[in-house]
């Protein structure tokens, strides 16, 4: 199969955000200072950890593109958001089902954390996907209603068919 054709028929994203278990991450010894920690005042236990590549110059020097990791120890959940630039030289392929594992492994190569890539792939739930091209599909009332549910401030928008070929 032609490599370009294979990737062009898949959904591709420029930015993704997903939620997974906090058990799927561990910090690398000696890199803890790159991560912001929040502590419970009474117990002294870490309640959350956060890495934001845009937070300061030191983080931007390590990760010159968008990467956000937030780990909540209390809820045992973790949110990760990154751009397709995490794919490095494969950036033009964008984030897809095929390149998502590579992006996670590249995140590990940054030296901030270790990830259980297989577990993340198994249990993650995406809550933000920036699509990079139109999706050809029939727009039914059910689909339009679902889009309303997944759109922030849904009361602000009214989905309507645009010349029977799209929505606005």
State where each predicted segment sits.
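Structured, helix-rich domain cores that form ligand/interaction pockets
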Residues: 1-168
């Amino acid at each position: 199969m032609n490599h370009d054709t294979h990737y062009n028929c898949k959904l591709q994203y420029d930015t993704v955000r997903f939620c997974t278990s906090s058990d799927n991450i561990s910090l690398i010894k000696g890199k803890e200072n790159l991560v912001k920690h929040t502590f419970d005042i009474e117990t002294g236990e870490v309640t959350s950890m956060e890495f934001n590549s845009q937070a300061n110059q030191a983080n931007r020097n390590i990760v010159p593109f968008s990467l956000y990791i937030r780990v909540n120890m209390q809820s045992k959940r973790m949110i990760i958001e990154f751009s397709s630039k995490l794919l490095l030289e494969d950036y033009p392929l964008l984030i897809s089902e095929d390149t998502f594992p590579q992006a996670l492994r590249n995140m590990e190569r940054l030296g901030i954390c270790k990830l259980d890539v297989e577990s993340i792939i198994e249990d993650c739930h995406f809550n933000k996907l920036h699509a990079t091209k139109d999706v050809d599909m029939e727009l039914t009332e059910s689909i339009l209603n679902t889009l309303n549910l997944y759109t922030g401030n849904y009361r602000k928008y009214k989905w309507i068919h645009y010349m029977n070929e799209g929505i606005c």
